[in-house]
From Swiss-Prot:
The gene is NMES1. InterPro entries: B12D. Belongs to the complex I NDUFA4 subunit family. This is Normal mucosa of esophagus-specific gene 1 protein. The lineage of its organism: Eukaryota, Metazoa, Chordata, Craniata, Vertebrata. Transmembrane segments: none annotated. Pfam families: B12D (PF06522).
Length: 83
């Protein structure tokens, strides 16, 4: 008995199969889409320090609302002392 014959015999499974197929396709598409982003690194041998090439002016978040970069005074003091 093939899969399609089973679906024709039990028609109540058709919506479940459709929803599961759409969900699996969407999850796979999102996984592939996420792998093509610039902040995902698949090959660490070519670029062992990828954080050096990140542009600080380009937001890495999906949405940034009223976010301004300011240096933290305490952190700057610690960096000056440790250098």
């Amino acid at each position: 008995m093939s899969f399609f014959q089973l679906l024709m015999k039990r028609k109540e499974l058709i919506p479940l199969v459709v929803f599961m197929t759409v969900a699996a396709g969407g999850a796979s598409s999102f996984a592939v889409y996420s792998l093509w982003k610039t902040d995902v690194i698949l090959d660490r041998k070519k670029n062992p320090e990828p954080w050096e090439t990140v542009d600080p002016t380009v937001p890495q978040k999906l949405i940034t609302i009223n976010q301004q970069w300011k240096p933290i005074e305490e952190l700057q003091n610690v960096q000056r002392v440790t250098k």
